[in-house]
């Protein structure tokens, strides 16, 4: 199929090359032989009058022209996929859809395992690829490379639609034997203690509690940085350090780790967990179904109010 002299199939090949950055992987992803992909590259070069790609060792290097074309081509293909092709009725029981979702280790533990259990019952062919927080999640959404982000809403852009899941309360935690946590924790003692904090991605982006503290003008003495919330409670054991984590996570680990949960002396720290999806997925039947599952399971979690009854363990 040609449009103004361009074989539209070549756009699919160009998108695969820009996504995979490998001729072999790109050819495999769109079911082309390597000779057929090499032919497509030659035709793309001829049409656009640009080299587009060159090999440097085993790495595929793209030209500025290829980089400029990539977003428009990706957007066009996604628009076709979700506005024209995906209008078939979605049957969860028969679907083999794989959802790619970016979320934290903590949300996987306290929330998403319930989603997995439910989907296994209602749609046994549906699968998930859960990904750690990325340095540029908005770009992955725009390119349709992930189906959902599950993040604190303060970290979400206004470009794509989102929905609230539930609110989170933050608490201070330390080892059960940490005598500095006995009685009321003063602001001075809190700020003098060594802290454990989570940071994410190659850029070591701050976690939500660190962002909230900085917004309030507080800077802690961080002595240990870990790549996820779930590592914090075990690494507090046997130390005098303290950390701020979501209450749901603290309650989860307090069942198996000698953990003391205390009220922190700072202004009430809380945030909202939300789910975000690409704007082009708004009317995609599979995405709609998955969003309903996420919101329904979030409502079940939010129903029992978090209380301070466990504080001061």
From Swiss-Prot:
Miscellaneous comment in the UniProt entry for this protein: There are at least three nodD genes in R.meliloti. They differ in their specificity of interaction with different flavonoids and, consequently, contribute to the nodulation of various plant host species to different extents.
Gene: nodD3
DNA-binding region(s), residue ranges: 23-42
Name recorded for this polypeptide: Nodulation protein D 3
Organism: Rhizobium meliloti (strain 1021)
Every HTH lysR-type domain range: 6-63
Summary of the function given for this chain in its UniProt record: NodD regulates the expression of the nodABCFE genes which encode other nodulation proteins. NodD is also a negative regulator of its own expression. Binds flavonoids as inducers.
Protein family membership: Belongs to the LysR transcriptional regulatory family.
Keywords linked to the UniProt accession: Activator, DNA-binding, Nodulation, Plasmid, Repressor, Transcription, Transcription regulation
Gene3D superfamilies tied to this protein: Periplasmic binding protein-like II, Winged helix-like DNA-binding domain superfamily/Winged helix DNA-binding domain
Pfam families, sorted: HTH_1
SUPFAM superfamilies linked: Periplasmic binding protein-like II, Winged helix' DNA-binding domain
UniProt-recorded Gene Ontology molecular function terms: DNA binding; DNA-binding transcription factor activity
CDD domains in UniProt: PBP2_NodD (cd08462)
